[in-house]
Amino acid sequence: MVMMLWYVLPLLLCSPCLLIQIPDEYKGHHVLEPPVITEQSPRRLVVFPTDDISLKCEARGRPQVEFRWTKDGIHFKPKEELGVVVHEAPYSGSFTIEGNNSFAQRFQGIYRCYASNNLGTAMSHEIQLVAEGAPKWPKETVKPVEVEEGESVVLPCNPPPSAAPLRIYWMNSKILHIKQDERVSMGQNGDLYFANVLTSDNHSDYICNAHFPGTRTIIQKEPIDLRVKPTNSMIDRKPRLLFPTNSSSHLVALQGQSLILECIAEGFPTPTIKWLHPSDPMPTDRVIYQNHNKTLQLLNVGEEDDGEYTCLAENSLGSARHAYYVTVEAAPYWLQKPQSHLYGPGETARLDCQVQGRPQPEVTWRINGMSIEKVNKDQKYRIEQGSLILSNVQPSDTMVTQCEARNQHGLLLANAYIYVVQLPARILTKDNQTYMAVEGSTAYLLCKAFGAPVPSVQWLDEEGTTVLQDERFFPYANGHLGIRDLQANDTGRYFCQAANDQNNVTILANLQVKEATQITQGPRSTIEKKGARVTFTCQASFDPSLQASITWRGDGRDLQERGDSDKYFIEDGQLVIKSLDYSDQGDYSCVASTELDEVESRAQLLVVGSPGPVPHLELSDRHLLKQSQVHLSWSPAEDHNSPIEKYDIEFEDKEMAPEKWFSLGKVPGNQTSTTLKLSPYVHYTFRVTAINKYGPGEPSPVSETVVTPEAAPEKNPVDVRGEGNETNNMVITWKPLRWMDWNAPQIQYRVQWRPLGKQETWKEQTVSDPFLVVSNTSTFVPYEIKVQAVNNQGKGPEPQVTIGYSGEDYPQVSPELEDITIFNSSTVLVRWRPVDLAQVKGHLRGYNVTYWWKGSQRKHSKRHVHKSHMVVPANTTSAILSGLRPYSSYHVEVQAFNGRGLGPASEWTFSTPEGVPGHPEALHLECQSDTSLLLHWQPPLSHNGVLTGYLLSYHPLDGESKEQLFFNLSDPELRTHNLTNLNPDLQYRFQLQATTHQGPGEAIVREGGTMALFGKPDFGNISVTAGENYSVVSWVPREGQCNFRFHILFKALPEGKVSPDHQPQPQYVSYNQSSYTQWDLQPDTKYEIHLMREKVLLHHLAVKTNGTGPVRVSTTGSFASEGWFIAFVSAIILLLLILLILCFIKRSKGGKYSVKDKEDTQVDSEARPMKDETFGEYRSLESDNEEKAFGSSQPSLNGDIKPLGSDDSLADYGGSVDVQFNEDGSFIGQYSGKKEKEAAGGNDSSGATSPINPAVALE
């Protein structure tokens, strides 16, 4: 059995060996036990004639206990009494007095029970038996009570006396309760008090009812007739106490019980009662006010409740008071109660009996129920400070003692035995137990021993040596062993040995010391923003033999994932908290635990964010509104762990701008009030927003609205301008005042104007709109202008004078060009002379320079002109034109402009010199053999001059030699060049440049070689699909891989399933073909596919055709001869013809849109090469047009179209006799007499770049 050591520690706190009784585990010995009272009746019993009376007295002991009783100190024999039944149960001396004999009065008295055996006598406490008869109200004659209206009266109850508590009810003859209030109430004594009577109190049936719970009966007093004499002159009087009647009284309250104080007063008007405790505050948590404040109940009275309690009765005429002086006393209570013990011979026995009470109780001792004074004087005892001490006890000293404490409020009795016994030592802890603990902790090995005398206990290690030589080992008085600061080498076996004068015994305890749990990486404290997520990480090391776990706590509460919320995510030692809120901040701890230990690592999470709303926004100092001021104050906002930097004060005017807030300014974050300067006539509603480093928080609740008084404007409009929109007017404009600057419900503007410098009388007009049109002015004349704000309270300040002008006309003069300086082939400088300002007819705003490309110097463009513009400031008379095309003609115009528009233009034409060409287009490499490559290219889009040829250079990328080889190709019409003697094992970098007289231009670069460097050719992404009688093999040719031929062989499996005549024959295929379709296969048949070259297997595949089984393949013809196929092809051809006719009809309708027109809007004739990533197929104009008409159709099914990249594909390129090129690579004859046909099949298509849809580049 393995014991976890945290369960052991409470056992170490038990008393050592000397127990109240012999342990149950101590078996195998016949041990006697002195008498012990186990149950007895309460100290006071109140019984009634019909009740059965049971007096209980039960006790245990060995040998069997005998019982005897005394009544009023005289021996009482229950068995000999008539009507008494003795209980014959074991361990019981109880008896019952039966209630049907009405003998209760005869058995009244004080009883005591004695339980005895050979070892002593135990004694019960005194039991007082009180017998009551049936309650009866004494016969009396009740006289009517007469009283004048407004006077006080007391209706007495005087119920019969009773030993048991009773309840009093006042009712009338209809069994309705008398209504009680501050004027009418019942006292604790049962009397009914009237502070003053009213005529409505006049009744003849006031009945006092007494309820006796013991007899379960209610008896009534004779009805009282209350007669109230009406009066017309009720006299007010001050309060007088009806109970108690004197000014003060003294009471004794018992500690731990309740104290009830009562004051009932009379007077008119009806007095009110309140209670005072002059010396100390009233203990409100223990005070209950009842009966309309006339009764004070103080619960659980303590010594601190000593003192004066005053009741005060008050009305409008005066007051009356009564002082209760309360003394708190106490019945005896235990400080230390004597306990029974077992002792061995020769030991000293000590029984402590410490009691307390007020007054101090008297303590007496008894031995076996007899007063200690009557015991033989040779007993070895003494009494010291209330304790009974016996020295050198022997078995004959076994006894039962009684300690009794008594004062006037009660008595206490305790039985305790001294049992002197000789018992052999015995270890009650199980033998061979295993204990586990972790390194660094404290282990507790149990050894519970019992015997008399008390056994001595020692612990030994495996070698029989005492363990106490190590200071880490410490014994407990009860025999257990503690080992602090455990180490791994403490693991082992330990022996506990217990011995007394009769024997010695030994048990084995096994200790296993495990590795302590350690947190290797604990969570770290962090600061996160509200709404973010935080991750805490925890890693720990555990003893591998223990079951371990990692849990998380937040502020001491266990955290777990919840199915209805994703707030927490816990996995693999991580705690993730999502959507952080301020309530999430606190301490988070990782708890790594095993069944032996647990360690905890804490981290603090601080959630920060923008502040909370500003509370308690208040307005004050309203008298300042007349001066357009107000005082605003607020309480600090919750800063959410980031200091508040400032408060933003905003206002809203719900009349002029509802739901729009304007800032009045900001104050420092440590300021919580400010006096605001306000504008006249604004309906201010304020709010305040706190701001910290994380931004503004929620605004405060809005304040109440205040309105400032109206006033004359304090500002005039700004940005006053005078400009004409016609040649004979002037439009005066200004920026209107904001509504908050109106200072009144409405605003107008007083506008004044006059010609500048003529000192004429000001003309004026008052308007509401923010503009005024002055008509019939001369062209471009200066005016003085003033604009002043006006409202119903007066005018604004004197406005400033602004100079404006009437309308402008178009400039009448063109700039005179001075010269044009050519910087280089793409940049020129244009200069002109300043214009005459008098001819500008307005403010000279600048110059507009317009220029456009007219065409190459070889040939002018006929397409749409695209013009470029440049605006030059008025103080500048030159412009640099850059980004021009080399070797081109340009037209330039310069115009002056004012606010009205542009004037006449000065024109000039210039040409740019020749430049270097752009890079050639579409350089491609085609492998001819292992040592040769054919290079294809297209001329550059931008010649920038006259092409003189091409410069080709290349060098190997690998190998030792990096020598650059150059070829100067002087034929500008050349489009291909063949390179030989290349190394098949190397890759090359090829660079091609076009040249003009200015030199080579930008290069186009490609890298490649003749063959793959290693192994077999690469069939990238090769795949195979199958139908019922065909299969398609597809692959992606690798760029730079030489084209080569190989054959594909389909072989049916298993062999023999298909006859040799029906086996497909090997077919030759080109690598660049990228796919191959094998027809005439058998359905539902598996085929092996071999790709072979010169008997070398290049690739191996397998495929299975669809269908239900082999079919006979026709040897007379293919499916192309079937009727359905012929009809299908005919339908397609007919559809294509219809589409072609529709296309020609459409082209003929738009015939005016020729290739020439389209080229004018897109490209120069120099820059219309046809290109494709696979070199492009150049055809005659007619064939090109035909291809474009069917550019989107699929190839025919007869397989006659030759795939791109085949061995014969070069025949389709530039060698065609129908194709002619001019010097820059464009087609000769594109504009020669076939315009309509060209328009029908020209560059209209928006399809992708291809040999039949060439890309068009704009120059």
Swiss-Prot record:
SMART domains: FN3, IG, IGc2
GO cellular component: axon; axonal growth cone; cell surface; dendrite; dendritic growth cone; endosome; external side of plasma membrane; GABA-ergic synapse
Region (Disordered): 697-724, 1182-1209, 1228-1259
Any Pfam family the entry gives: fn3
All ranges on the Extracellular side of the membrane: 20-1122
GO molecular function: axon guidance receptor activity; identical protein binding; integrin binding; PDZ domain binding; protein domain specific binding; sialic acid binding
Residue ranges that the UniProt entry lists as topological domain Cytoplasmic: 1146-1259
Coiled-coil spans in chain: none
Bias (Basic and acidic residues): 712-724
Domain Ig-like C2-type: 35-128, 138-225, 239-327, 332-419, 424-506, 517-600
Gene Ontology BP annotations: axon development; axon guidance; axonal fasciculation; calcium-mediated signaling; cell migration; cell surface receptor signaling pathway; cell-cell adhesion mediated by integrin; cell-matrix adhesion
Phosphoserine: residues bearing it: 1165, 1180, 1183, 1196, 1245-1246, 1250
Motif position, Cell attachment site: 553-555, 562-564
Membrane topology according to the record: Single-pass type I membrane protein
Sites carrying sugar chains: 100, 202, 246, 293, 432, 489, 504, 670, 725, 776, 824, 848, 875, 968, 978, 1021, 1029, 1072, 1106
PANTHER family: CTX-RELATED TYPE I TRANSMEMBRANE PROTEIN (PTHR12231), L1 CELL ADHESION MOLECULE (PTHR12231:SF241)
Biological role: Neural cell adhesion molecule involved in the dynamics of cell adhesion and in the generation of transmembrane signals at tyrosine kinase receptors. During brain development, critical in multiple processes, including neuronal migration, axonal growth and fasciculation, and synaptogenesis. In the mature brain, plays a role in the dynamics of neuronal structure and function, including synaptic plasticity.
Record-given protein name: Neural cell adhesion molecule L1
UniProt gene name: L1cam
